[in-house]
Amino acid sequence: MIILGLVLVSLLASTASAIQAWMPQVITGHEGRPLSVRCHYAGKNPSKPMTMMLLKTIEGSAFRGTIVPRFKGPVYTKSSCSSGTGVFTVDSLHMADAGRYACMVSQENDPKDESVCSDYHTAYTNIVVLETRRRRSLLGPQLTPTAGPRSTQLSQTTGPLSSQESEFSVVAVRKGVKVYVGSSLHVECQFSGATAGLNISAVLFKKVGEGAYQAVSTISTSSLTTLDLSPVIEGTGQAKWCGVNATKEDSGEYMCMIGMDFPEGEEGSGDEDFSGVDFFKITVVTEPGEDADEDDYLYTSSEEEKK
């Protein structure tokens, strides 16, 4: 049984208080051919400049990564005053380009605005490079696509967060989130298969018992007090919950629920389900130090479970 305390938020009326970014989980390209890497953003303050960088992450390092000069950009498309897409391009993809990449967006905020959880956000993707047919025939048919040390046997798609998908789906960006007491805390769930112009609703639940979940908005001790919903861009978007002062009470199991609402009487407003859920875990530790949140981004879900 799910204890509902729903607070439905319309994308058309929401106002983001913190910058955020999202990307497909996997981007596939072919050796020797051009590739475009798209990084969507929302929550931009129109009165302040925004910076976007594409970095290749460093294996085993908490440092975010290094710039790859061959990737040019970003060129901004589909831009409004607060959201849009930055596109990075490379003319000829190399096998060495395979790996995990970070898109970091940052914007200076007013330090007096305590509602802003962060002035930067990092989204991640895995670039898979497929060998050309000629090279594959020379090296043998046993070779598999290269995705870098963090990914193996990835499919030739852009993952569950692709604008090519027509079915509405939801996925938590991180299955395990670990931060220190007193640090900022943010969690994200992405959705795909959405129709632009329709209302999107998002609710975050915390597990309070066996099979029972309660809306975080009704839990007075929760630090996740701010919800930022992005607009739909190329069929995808993101819900970001955040807070500025994590406590031990924030630890636990969570479920995010995102739905797409059709106006009454329109196609899609019947019994078909246009909502999705995913689950993740938050751990708040007492060890002092810098915010652990961004460092956790550098691990895959399976690696996080081992920590």
UniProtKB/Swiss-Prot annotation:
First and last residue of the signal peptide: 1-18
Start-end of Polar residues biased regions: 143-160
Keyword vocabulary terms for this entry: Signal
Disordered: annotated span: 139-160
Keyword Signal among UniProt keywords: yes
InterPro entries per record: Ig-like_dom_sf, Ig-like_fold, Ig_sub
Identification of the protein by name: Uncharacterized gene E2 protein
Organism: Equine herpesvirus 2 (strain 86/87)
Gene it is expressed from: E2
